[in-house]
Amino acid sequence: MTTARPNSYRSGPDERGHFGIFGGRFVAETLMPLILDLEKAYADAKADPAFQAEMNSYRTHYVGRPSPLYYAERLTQHLGGAKIYFKRDELNHTGSHKVNNVLGQIMLARRMGKRRIIAETGAGQHGVATATLCARFGLDCVVYMGAVDVERQQPNVLRMEMLGAKVVPVQSGARTLKDAMNEALRDWVTNVHDTFYCIGTVAGPHPYPMMVRDFQSVIGDETRVQMQEAEGRLPDSLVACIGGGSNAMGLFHPFLDDPSVEIFGVEAAGHGLTQLHAASIAGGRPGVLHGNRTYLLMDEDGQIAEAHSISAGLDYPGIGPEHSWLFEAKRVTYLSATDDEALAAFQLLSRLEGIIPALEPAHAIAKVMELAPKKPKEHLMVVNLCGRGDKDVPQVGEILRKRAKES
């Protein structure tokens, strides 16, 4: 484990859950006792060697960690420039990084005596991971999913139902991830006695952004060790896609105090930053949503704007509060990739490396296609391949068929 130093980028949040002006806990009065209970339970679990040992055992024997650090030789040759490595978190059980966080939260729920688990999901990967761990531990599971996402992510809906979860399509608002999170929060308020809300990203009220980051930091901790083994030194740059930003925070956090490591987060630019998109840093401003202050997409009246991305997992009008702080602190550079750029990267990676990525990390690959050729050959670049693309093949196939007909 890497440890934070004084004046560190890794020392947040403070005791009230703030990263600078971001974060906090803006919740209904009925939820505050739960939030405080959760914070205490997490602090106790974090300090308990038995909890950590049990989690590490499940990571090894159930999740399949550590995930490999893979040299993408053909992509490197194709692009010229930087030597590109993939952190292969799509090889985890359930097919994405989401299981890292869900394992920790479900273990915490059991420790707190909660038998009913609720979750929100966009692409369905967090929902699948939650349904999987609930099946493993014999817990009731309800997953809220925007009706639009239910349509475009049918394979994951079927997986969740197969695993015994109840999937609730959300018909309000734009019927995507924000609306699913709203419904999950409503459920939690009315079922506080027996229900644990398993949030899927580094958002929500404190302690969620910190807790999810800590559970996901296994990605960056492994990468440090693996890169030293492979190259004898740290990487020169890191690249990861960002919706709420948990896969990115998991990779970035252990490297924040290494000034030699450049860090790039990639938001979803959708149809373009002047049109419909989901790039909260590039096109948003600070506000409050889902229990925390962060950068959000808002209209001129301060109402939350609708986000758009080809990728259901990035289709969220906000970003984790720690990302907002890292942006303002200028430690991380935030870029954005359009739907079309992500589609091109999805196809390129499938054909060059025999790896079909999820549309979410395809956004990160799209920016690697721009960044890598500008770097010298000795530059070591690590990309978090945070999800596999099985869930997206029907959607991408349909888009490509339509385009072929039109051309």
Curated annotation (Swiss-Prot):
Keywords for the protein's UniProt record, in alphabetical order: Amino-acid biosynthesis, Aromatic amino acid biosynthesis, Lyase, Pyridoxal phosphate, Tryptophan biosynthesis
Protein's UniProt name: Tryptophan synthase beta chain
Purpose: The beta subunit is responsible for the synthesis of L-tryptophan from indole and L-serine.
Gene3D superfamilies named in the record: 3.40.50.1100
Entry keyword Lyase: yes
GO CC terms, sorted: cytoplasm
EC number: 4.2.1.20
Cited NCBIfam families: trpB
Upper taxonomic lineage: Bacteria, Pseudomonadati, Pseudomonadota, Alphaproteobacteria, Hyphomicrobiales
Organism of this sequence: Bradyrhizobium sp. (strain BTAi1 / ATCC BAA-1182)
Catalytic reactions of this protein: (1S,2R)-1-C-(indol-3-yl)glycerol 3-phosphate + L-serine = D-glyceraldehyde 3-phosphate + L-tryptophan + H2O
Complexes and interactors: Tetramer of two alpha and two beta chains.
Family the UniProt entry places it in: Belongs to the TrpB family.
Cofactor(s) annotated in UniProt: pyridoxal 5'-phosphate
Pathway: Amino-acid biosynthesis; L-tryptophan biosynthesis; L-tryptophan from chorismate: step 5/5
Enzyme kind, highest EC tier: lyase
